[in-house]
Amino acid sequence: SGVIRFAGEEIRSLPVLELRRRMGYAIQSIGLFPHWSVAQNIATVPQLQKWSRARIDDRIDELMALLGLEPNLRERYPHQLSGGQQQRVGVARALAADPQVLLMDEPFGALDPVTRGALQQEMTRIHRLLGRTIVLVTHDIDEALRLAEHLVLMDHGEVVQQGNPLTMLTHPANDFVRQFFGRSELGVRLLSLRSVADYVRREERAEGEALEERMTLRDALSLFVARGCEVLPVVN
């Protein structure tokens, strides 16, 4: 038991319809309407809120561009899209009415690793651009560490520990937390929380495939091993 507050108000004191209008929701099964086009799916909530046709069309175009969906997909149906494209449409629909909070329940769990990684990067970019609060439920530890600014770890319905990812990894509250994040993988996961930009030797020059400053040290280490080298250039 406990209390959930939304914008400072206990949610049970707010009308359900008002709550729904202030939140977007994206789930693992996506839940697109199969008989509606991409554009119609994205427009679902704005239409319910009786936006003008012109405003809805502009919002569809804006979100498709934001999520990397080509304009020629606008009139296609869900069965004509890849899994990654369907998930992007699902996120676009969740964002369509510009909600204050985006709820995501295992949104990338059914996708292949490459598509999942690409969408995780997209969500990080979208979060930076829009500044919206995103509440993400996941069982993927690395996904949580990659995406979250604040983590809440639960066990049997109770909060075991919460805090930023670095604190959770380096100062676990108890042995359950320590085991959950993996004793043997702790070092590698810590690399996921630090960026290349913090360790650049700007006075040196190097040749080879360039790293990006925003990359994590974990991704950079992977490239070092794959290329069999100890030094690589960095671009911003």
Which positions does each model-derived feature cover?
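ABC ATPase NBD coupling module
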Residues: 10-24, 48
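Conserved ABC ATPase "signature" region
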Residues: 47, 54-72
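Short coil-to-helix segment of the ABC ATPase nucleotide-binding domain corresponding to the Q-loop/switch region
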Residues: 36-43
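Catalytic Walker B motif of ABC-type/P-loop ATPase nucleotide-binding domains
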Residues: 102-105
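Conserved ABC ATPase signature
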Residues: 77-81, 85
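ABC ATPase "signature
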Residues: 162-163, 171
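A short, proline-enriched helix->beta-strand linker immediately N-terminal to the Walker B motif
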Residues: 96-100
